[in-house]
Curated annotation (Swiss-Prot):
Family the entry assigns: Belongs to the bacterial ribosomal protein bL12 family.
Pfam families, alphabetized: Ribosomal_L12 (PF00542), Ribosomal_L12_N (PF16320)
Keywords assigned: Ribonucleoprotein, Ribosomal protein
Domain of life where this protein originates: Bacteria
Molecular function GO terms recorded: mRNA binding; structural constituent of ribosome
Function noted in UniProt: Forms part of the ribosomal stalk which helps the ribosome interact with GTP-bound translation factors. Is thus essential for accurate translation.
Assembly and oligomerization: Homodimer. Part of the ribosomal stalk of the 50S ribosomal subunit. Forms a multimeric L10(L12)X complex, where L10 forms an elongated spine to which 2 to 4 L12 dimers bind in a sequential fashion. Binds GTP-bound translation factors.
Name of the protein in its database record: Large ribosomal subunit protein bL12
Gene Ontology cellular component terms for the protein in this record: cytosolic large ribosomal subunit
GO biological process, one term: translation
InterPro entries named among the record's database cross-references: Ribosomal_bL12, Ribosomal_bL12_C, Ribosomal_bL12_C/ClpS-like, Ribosomal_bL12_oligo, Ribosomal_bL12_oligo_N_sf
Length: 121
């Protein structure tokens, strides 16, 4: 006579937490598997699906040093002086859209060093 799943579940539910931990360790050794690895593998694809690949850099405010921010905006966008000044003065405004995470973070860092308040979406 073999043991059913229900009988196993009943037996495990009657065990103390320490007994369950010992049971799991024994099963990992017996079958050469790790319970943590199975959880990580199951969670892996979900995280990959949620990861965003394109980011927008939004200038929230120019800050106290507007001239330095205008220079940073010109360098990042290739705009002329007047266009960059108008963009900075019209904050909040999108500086770049659909760029990689690394590029967005680098742009954010350079603008923040110039004194701007920046958001990456």
């Amino acid at each position: 006579m073999s043991i059913t799943k229900d009988q196993i579940i009943e037996a495990v539910s009657a065990m103390s937490v320490m007994d369950v931990v010992e049971l799991i360790s024994a099963m990992e050794e017996k079958f050469g598997v790790s319970a943590a690895a199975a959880v990580a593998v199951a969670a892996g694809p979900v995280e990959a699906a949620e990861e965003k690949t394109e980011f927008d850099v939004i200038l929230k405010a120019a800050g106290a040093n507007k001239v330095a921010v205008i220079k940073a905006v010109r360098g990042a966008t290739g705009l002329g002086l007047k266009e960059a000044k108008d963009l900075v003065e019209s904050a909040p405004a999108a500086l770049k859209e659909g760029i990689s995470k690394d590029d967005a973070e680098a742009l954010k860092k350079s603008l923040e060093e110039a004194g701007a308040e920046v958001e990456v979406k």
